[in-house]
Structures are given as C-alpha cells and as structure tokens.
C-alpha cells in the first residue's frame, strides 16, 4: 500500500506541473510576435539607412534588388516583396523618394506572429503603425 501512495503522490505532482506549465505556453506566441515585430522595426530602420546610402552613392533610391546588389542589404531581401519573420516587405522607390511597408503575412514556412502593420518613407524616416490595415503616413508614429 505504501508504494501506491507514493505513486499517487508522484502522479499528482507531475499532473500539477504539466497543467501549470500549459499556462505559460499561452504567453509564448505573444513573446514571439513581439520579437518578430522588433525585428521588423529594426529592419525598417536598416532599409532606411540602406536607401540613404544608395542615394548618396548612386543618385537615386532603389528597390530591394538594387539595395542588395549594391551591398547595402543582405540576400534575405532579394525580390520584389521579401518575407522575413512573418512580415512581407514592399518598396516603392524613385529618384527622389521611397516608401516601405511591412505587413504581417502567412507562408507555409513562416506563420504570422506579428499583428501590426508598419510604414516608413524618405521624408522623415519615422515609422508609422496601424493595427488593422496596411500603414500609411497618416497613421500614428511608433
């Protein structure tokens, strides 16, 4: 009978630890989402710096391919709309200005964890944010 009591005690402790740890698992997606949004914000700042460098050296702003070919961004940004950490980036660039958007996207290999949409342009390099739709200059500053 003693072994039965020990077994019951150990089983109860294991069950209690499993149920308490499942509460912590709910926080994990939020932490990952915050991390992915932080990565996206830093990426937008890096893109703005790369655009300034491209304009200074080549006389105009450029798209992701121009920025990567010039060596100002790494190859993760190759293509018209690269997808990094659950965000799809897009650039509209001309000789005199550029606009960058980063919007949450889901792919087979990268599920969306961030929820906010981000915008940055060449006029002031300030990041604007919108929680429901693609951000624009009219949205609040981050």
Describe the function of each predicted region:
Residues 14-17:
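C-terminal motif of bacterial Sec signal peptides marking the signal peptidase cleavage site
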Residues 19-22:
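Bacterial signal peptide processing site
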Residues 33-44:
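Membrane-proximal amphipathic alpha-helices
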Residues 26-30, 49-114, 122-123, 140-142:
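Extracellular/periplasmic head regions of type IV pilus-like filament subunits
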Residues 12, 123-127:
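Short secondary-structure subsegments characteristic of cysteine-rich extracellular domains
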Residues 1-7:
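Bacterial N-terminal signal peptides that target proteins for export
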